[in-house]
């Protein structure tokens, strides 16, 4: 089968590798779509995603969809359209029974965080644990289903923030994650949603989603102490500082965007 492999910084190759066979408890998927996450770009342009350095050829891709190709258990019918929960979980620690995503030694598709690396879905076929497979509801296309994982990021941020129903919500950074978080906030009953970005294009897309207000960073003023919930999706220190000033007293900031490695100048005095 053909697969995309990142060998290091600026070194991406399409190679032929043996088609894998599913073992007990596994399913083989025929891939249809794979989104390109920011982490995938870091692996390509930098040879690393933060502290996770590419040490062997890495197939990226965790925002995926496809169809069932082979299920040795017979539970899933070949051709069934699916997406994938891209994580497997490590060992539970006391007090973390209900928080599997915090368990140490977990793994993630298309990640150099483990050794050997956990290969991702930018290939013709992918082997996953059966429990990672999510059959699609009727009417959801494979193309749209590839957005399930980034949508889940935004929805998780909303859940961590305690929900947004009836609340004034600020989304900082209107890239794909920010826009999906905004869509999730609208669908979850937010009273109003405001999106910010440094570029006009993302703000146009936010308005197309139904967002009530958009603010251009550097051109429009962000009102102070005005939002019940802030979903910070950029990871930019200046934006984090702006969000601290914008959230109301006793409001909530959910930090969804990832910062780059190293200390960051975030002013906590306002809190």
Where do the model's predicted regions map?
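NAD(P)H dinucleotide-binding glycine-rich loop of Rossmann-like/cofactor-binding domains
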Residues: 90-172
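Glycine-rich phosphate-binding loop and adjacent beta-alpha segment
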Residues: 237-271
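Short glycine-centered segments of the SAM/dcSAM-binding site in methyltransferase folds
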Residues: 81, 168, 251-253
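A short acidic, Gly/Pro-enriched loop at the edge of an enzyme's catalytic core
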Residues: 25, 222-230
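N-terminal glycine-rich cofactor-binding segment
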Residues: 5-21, 38-65, 83-86, 103-117
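Mid-domain Rossmann-like dinucleotide-binding core that forms the NAD(H)/NADP(H) cofactor-binding site
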Residues: 79, 137-219
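Glycine-rich beta-strand-centered segment in the early N-terminal region that forms part
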Residues: 20-34, 48-96, 137-139
């Amino acid at each position: 089968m053909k697969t995309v492999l990142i060998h290091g910084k600026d070194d991406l190759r399409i190679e032929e590798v043996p088609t894998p066979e599913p073992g007990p408890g596994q399913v083989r998927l025929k891939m249809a779509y794979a989104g390109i996450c920011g982490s995938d770009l870091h692996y390509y342009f930098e040879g690393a995603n933060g502290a996770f350095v590419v040490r062997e050829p890495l197939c990226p891709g965790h925002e995926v969809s496809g169809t069932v190709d082979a299920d040795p258990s017979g539970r899933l019918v070949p051709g069934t359209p699916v997406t994938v929960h891209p994580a497997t979980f490590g060992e539970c620690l006391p007090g973390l029974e209900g928080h599997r995503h915090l368990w140490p030694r977990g793994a993630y598709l298309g990640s150099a965080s483990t050794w050997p690396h956990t290969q991702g879905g930018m290939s013709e076929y992918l082997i996953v644990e059966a429990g990672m497979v999510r059959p699609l509801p009727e009417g959801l296309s494979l193309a749209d289903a590839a957005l399930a994982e980034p949508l889940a990021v935004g929805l998780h941020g909303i859940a961590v923030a305690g929900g947004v129903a009836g609340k004034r919500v600020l989304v900082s950074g209107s890239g794909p994650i920010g826009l999906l978080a905004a869509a999730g906030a609208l669908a979850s009953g937010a009273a109003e949603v405001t999106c910010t970005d440094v570029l006009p294009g993302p703000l146009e897309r936010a308005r197309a989603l139904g967002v009530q207000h958009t603010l251009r960073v550097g051109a429009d003023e962000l009102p102070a102490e005005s939002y019940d919930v802030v979903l910070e999706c950029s990871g930019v220190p200046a934006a984090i500082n702006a969000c601290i000033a914008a959230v109301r007293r006793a409001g909530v900031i959910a930090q969804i965007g990832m910062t780059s490695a190293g200390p960051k100048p975030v002013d906590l005095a306002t809190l």
